[in-house]
């Protein structure tokens, strides 16, 4: 059973910005924006231990698990009977190290500050399952989208911490489409474009904040946004036979143009040469913890092959597959992927929310520790235009009630909670809405 309490931070945060949307199927024009509302109670200054309290890793894999606790800083973390091979940073609450022996390790923790203390239990499970709780974090797709860069990824990572969202479990910082450059390096893997000068140092900084890093790809030859994918027309990784001339590309590395360029040019399919294997090695070497693999139709053999490549990469990397998983393969997909999209792309209007929410019941038997249904990202806060290099953002078109509905429903069905808004202009007060606790 899941008990949900909306704490002070995320939904009222993004809800207190002005919003305008309709409860109907996209009428035009929309009604005048409604004033923001706040339904969540104020945050306690005393320590509160939030979810997740359960973490999974494979034997011998690097562990980085942040104890999520809200309350006034500075705060002190203590743990008794830590399993051999890991240590706790008493100031940040981040547990790091490696555990070689399979098993379940539970240990008590105490968190204290000037207003009091709280106690709880953390469990680390070492085996073949990871992602034992639904992922929570942020993705670039509905905000920076085609303008995603190392600079705005690191800015968002710092804002997740400084805003307090990380204290409620929002720990993944995920790069979506549009980061890709050409193939190269020792693995002949996809290298980043010029907006990402140093992936390894970026991941290192994200980890230093107690967060985790995510990346995006596809088993197609081209992504939805027209960038290089995980398969190739030839062993050399040369896509020139399919690509647009450079002077016709929206961005230099956008080989196939904007969506639906990959479909139009024949790149929206799995190519004859599989290169995900070397891409996975590169992601692991850079330090990524999560990958979204995006294609249609999702199929079991490709998913199994991707999962095997990630497992061989030498790093625990969560596998999220997108989009529109056929329900007929829910069983085998739920045994292979950690996260799978149950829908197409969500939009910030009631018609989209209603359609998605109404279709989720049949998926529920397939969700559980390590494997989660994904009805797509939260449409809360200030959003950009998908696929565009956004530098300005507009408030979501969802009404405050619709935003609270999405937060509540997604939490009740144990869905991933991935926000995708621009966090920079969101004030401390505005961040009161995404702080959802699951028990």
Question: Which residue stretches match the model-derived regions?
Answer:
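Extracellular interdomain linkers/hinges and stalk-like, low-complexity segments
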Residues: 25-71, 116-134
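A short beta-strand micro-motif common to beta-rich folds, especially ectodomain repeats
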Residues: 67, 103-113
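Solvent-exposed loop segments of extracellular immunoglobulin-like
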Residues: 73-77
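Strand-loop-strand motifs at the edges of beta-sheets in extracellular beta-sandwich domains
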Residues: 85-101
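An acidic-aromatic substrate-binding cleft motif
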Residues: 125-150
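Aromatic-lined carbohydrate-binding/catalytic grooves of carbohydrate-active enzymes
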Residues: 156, 160-290, 295, 300
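Glycan-recognition surfaces
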Residues: 250-255, 265-268, 301, 316-422
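Conserved small/polar residues in nucleotide/adenosyl-binding loops
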Residues: 429-439
């Amino acid at each position: 059973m899941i008990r949900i309490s909306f704490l002070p931070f995320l939904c009222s945060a993004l809800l207190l910005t002005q919003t305008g949307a309709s409860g109907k199927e996209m009428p035009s024009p929309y009604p005048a924006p409604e004033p923001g509302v706040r339904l969540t109670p104020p945050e306690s200054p005393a320590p509160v231990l939030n979810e997740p309290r359960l973490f999974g890793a494979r034997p011998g894999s690097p562990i980085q698990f942040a104890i999520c606790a809200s309350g006034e800083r500075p705060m002190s973390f203590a743990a008794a009977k830590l399993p051999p091979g890991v240590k706790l940073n008493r100031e940040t609450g981040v547990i790091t190290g490696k555990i070689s022996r399979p098993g379940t390790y539970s240990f008590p923790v105490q968190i204290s500050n000037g207003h009091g203390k709280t106690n709880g239990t953390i469990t680390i499970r070492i085996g073949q399952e990871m992602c034992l709780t639904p992922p929570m974090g942020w993705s670039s797709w509905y905000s920076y989208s085609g303008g995603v860069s190392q600079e705005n990824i690191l800015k968002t990572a710092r804002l997740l911490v400084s805003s307090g969202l990380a204290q409620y479990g929002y720990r993944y910082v995920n790069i979506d489409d549009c980061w890709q450059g050409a193939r190269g390096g020792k693995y002949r893997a996809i290298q980043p474009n010029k907006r990402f000068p140093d992936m390894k140092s970026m991941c290192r900084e994200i980890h230093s904040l107690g967060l985790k890093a995510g990346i995006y790809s596809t088993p197609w030859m081209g992504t939805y946004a027209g960038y290089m994918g995980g398969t190739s027309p030839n062993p050399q990784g040369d896509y020139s036979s399919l690509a647009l001339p450079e002077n016709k590309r929206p961005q230099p590395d956008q080989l196939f143009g904007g969506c639906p360029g990959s479909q139009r040019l024949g790149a929206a399919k799995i190519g004859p040469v599989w290169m995900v294997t070397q891409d996975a090695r590169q992601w692991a070497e850079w330090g990524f913890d999560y990958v979204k693999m995006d294609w249609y139709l999702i199929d079991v053999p490709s998913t199994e092959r991707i999962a095997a490549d990630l497992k061989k990469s030498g790093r625990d990397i969560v596998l999220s597959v997108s989009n529109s998983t056929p329900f007929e393969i829910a069983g085998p997909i739920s045994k292979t992927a950690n996260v799978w999209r149950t829908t197409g792309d969500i939009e910030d209007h009631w018609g989209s929310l209603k359609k998605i929410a109404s279709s989720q019941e049949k998926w529920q038997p397939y969700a559980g520790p390590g494997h989660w249904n994904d009805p797509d990202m939260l449409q809360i806060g200030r959003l950009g235009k998908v696929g565009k290099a956004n530098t300005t953002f507009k408030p979501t078109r969802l009404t405050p009630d619709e935003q609270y509905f999405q937060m509540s429903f997604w939490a009740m069905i144990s869905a991933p909670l991935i926000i995708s808004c621009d966090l920079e202009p969101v004030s401390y007060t505005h961040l009161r809405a995404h702080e959802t606790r699951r028990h």
